[in-house]
Amino acid sequence: MRRLKQIIKSFTLWELLKGLSLTLRYFYRKKVTIHYPDEEVPSSFRFRGMLALRRYPNGEERCIACKLCEAVCPACAITIEAGPREADGSRRTTLYDIDAFKCINCGFCEEACPVDAIVLTPEMHYSIKDRGENILTKEKLLMIGDRYEEQIARDRAKDKKYR
């Protein structure tokens, strides 16, 4: 009797029918796939994307060259050199470079900064095409910060309660 059941199951392709029934069940369910280039993936306001340097509202750069971000970076991606400023002699950065190949976007530099000078922007779509573009200089970082300043300020306001 057992052998007969086995023959009938193999003749009717029982396993194939079970698989097809499972496929049909999932075929009519709501799709959860996002077609990436055409549809944007929703991201949190805490998303850690491209790095940027911020300025004060009067246009002065925020970085005071304390080198805490350089010290806390686990990938050693940040290089800072400091010097006195001509106007009042306070310490400012003369060189602020970040190697994008080394950076792991951990956010430690952002947390360590006492004046919120370095931030991670919500920009996730960036590429490096030429040799040497991986070094983000102070000027590039300030330009990125100027471009995203409004959005950074909005995201900081949302997150203020938790900081």
UniProtKB/Swiss-Prot annotation:
Q: Where is the 4Fe-4S ferredoxin-type domain?
A: 53-83, 94-123
Q: Where in the cell is it found?
A: Cell inner membrane
Please give the catalytic activity noted in the UniProt record. a quinone + NADH + 5 H(+)(in) = a quinol + NAD(+) + 4 H(+)(out)
Q: Which Pfam families match?
A: Fer4_7
Q: Could you say which EC number(s) this protein's record lists?
A: 7.1.1.-
Which SUPFAM superfamilies does the record match to this protein? alpha-helical ferredoxin
This protein's membrane topology, according to the annotation, is: Peripheral membrane protein
Q: Which UniProt keywords apply?
A: 4Fe-4S, Cell inner membrane, Cell membrane, Iron, Iron-sulfur, Membrane, Metal-binding, NAD, Quinone, Repeat, Translocase, Ubiquinone
For biological process, the GO terms are: aerobic respiration
So which cofactors does this thing need?
[4Fe-4S] cluster
Q: How is the cofactor bound?
A: Binds 2 [4Fe-4S] clusters per subunit.
Note whether 4Fe-4S occurs among the keywords: yes
Annotated binding of [4Fe-4S] cluster 2, by residue: C73, C103, C106, C109
Q: Which is an annotated GO molecular function term of this record? A: iron ion binding
Keyword DNA-binding in annotation: no
Q: Name one GO cellular component term.
A: plasma membrane
Q: Which positions does UniProt annotate for [4Fe-4S] cluster 1 binding?
A: C63, C66, C69, C113
Main location as per UniProt: membrane
Q: Which InterPro entries match?
A: 4Fe4S_Fe-S-bd, 4Fe4S_Fe_S_CS, NADH_quinone_OxRdtase_chainI
Assembly information from the UniProt record: NDH-1 is composed of 14 different subunits. Subunits NuoA, H, J, K, L, M, N constitute the membrane sector of the complex.
Q: What does this protein do?
A: NDH-1 shuttles electrons from NADH, via FMN and iron-sulfur (Fe-S) centers, to quinones in the respiratory chain. The immediate electron acceptor for the enzyme in this species is believed to be ubiquinone. Couples the redox reaction to proton translocation (for every two electrons transferred, four hydrogen ions are translocated across the cytoplasmic membrane), and thus conserves the redox energy in a proton gradient.
User: Which protein family is named in the record?
Assistant: Belongs to the complex I 23 kDa subunit family.
Report what the protein is called.
Answer: NADH-quinone oxidoreductase subunit I
Q: Which species does this protein come from?
A: Coxiella burnetii (strain RSA 493 / Nine Mile phase I)
